Curated annotation (Swiss-Prot):
It is found in: Cytoplasm. The lineage of its organism: Bacteria, Pseudomonadati, Pseudomonadota, Betaproteobacteria, Nitrosomonadales. Its main location: cytoplasm. Its EC number is 2.3.1.181. GO terms for molecular function: lipoyl(octanoyl) transferase activity. This is Octanoyltransferase. The record marks K133 as: Lowers pKa of active site Cys. Residues 30-204 form the BPL/LPL catalytic domain. Catalyzes the transfer of endogenously produced octanoic acid from octanoyl-acyl-carrier-protein onto the lipoyl domains of lipoate-dependent enzymes. Lipoyl-ACP can also act as a substrate although octanoyl-ACP is likely to be the physiological substrate. The keyword Acyltransferase applies. GO terms for cellular component: cytoplasm. It comes from the Bacteria. The gene is lipB. It catalyses: octanoyl-[ACP] + L-lysyl-[protein] = N(6)-octanoyl-L-lysyl-[protein] + holo-[ACP] + H(+).
Length: 204
């Protein structure tokens, strides 16, 4: 059985984390252990490789960074749990679609612990509660390994989402754990989310 190392990185600037992920992936070998990084970012919009500038509706003081993950624009900020997945997909015998389903499943299983019913959407990857998005997904695959991962809204200021079409969808509502009555702190939720993903990965 393969193991995954979980590292708590605290608050990390987006560019710093992104460069670290690229370096890790470029330097890894077939023997490099897989890692999950838990962190949060200072306020930042990130725009995926297919991102269209018009999805930033109201430019503001929050910086916009064009990144190498898939997808459109989203927001990261304090109170949002980031799970970066640095995995060898060959090791786990996963294709991208299977990995995305496991990412969604990790969030769905976590929320089910709090009696919150959530679901994925094959046409718009992510996790939703009553049509409102609580988790965004993004990935980059390089030489059979992935980076980027899951952004889970725990207890944050959701206002910056109103300045964008989240993930490129006009009028898409967003929600967070706090507004769903989940009182556990973000640190506990982050730990539980990481374990939930590992359970998905190992089919526990």
């Amino acid at each position: 059985m393969f193991t995954v190392t979980v590292k708590n990185m605290g608050t990390t600037e987006y560019l710093t984390a992104w460069q670290a992920m690229k370096n890790f992936t470029a330097q890894r070998t077939c023997e490099t252990p897989d890692e999950i990084w838990l962190l949060e970012h200072p306020p930042v919009y990130t725009q995926g490789i297919a991102g269209k500038p018009e999805h930033l509706l109201f430019p503001n003081q929050i910086p916009v960074i064009k990144t190498d993950r898939g997808g459109q624009i989203t927001y990261h900020g304090p109170g949002q749990i980031i799970l970066y997945l640095l995995l060898d997909l060959h090791r786990w015998r996963l294709n991208i679609r299977q990995l995305v389903r496991k990412m969604e499943g990790a969030v769905i299983d976590l929320l089910s612990e709090y009696d919150v019913v959530a679901q994925g959407d094959e046409n718009a990857p992510g996790v939703y509660v009553d049509g409102a998005k609580i988790a965004s997904l993004g990935l980059k695959i390089r030489r059979g390994a992935c980076y980027h991962g899951i952004a889970f809204n725990a207890d944050m200021d959701l206002t910056p989402f109103t300045a964008i079409n989240p993930c490129g969808y006009r009028g898409l509502r967003v929600t967070q754990a706090k507004d769903l009555g989940i009182a556990d702190c973000k640190e506990m939720l982050a730990t539980k989310l990481a374990q939930s993903f590992i359970n998905q990965l190992t089919d526990v």
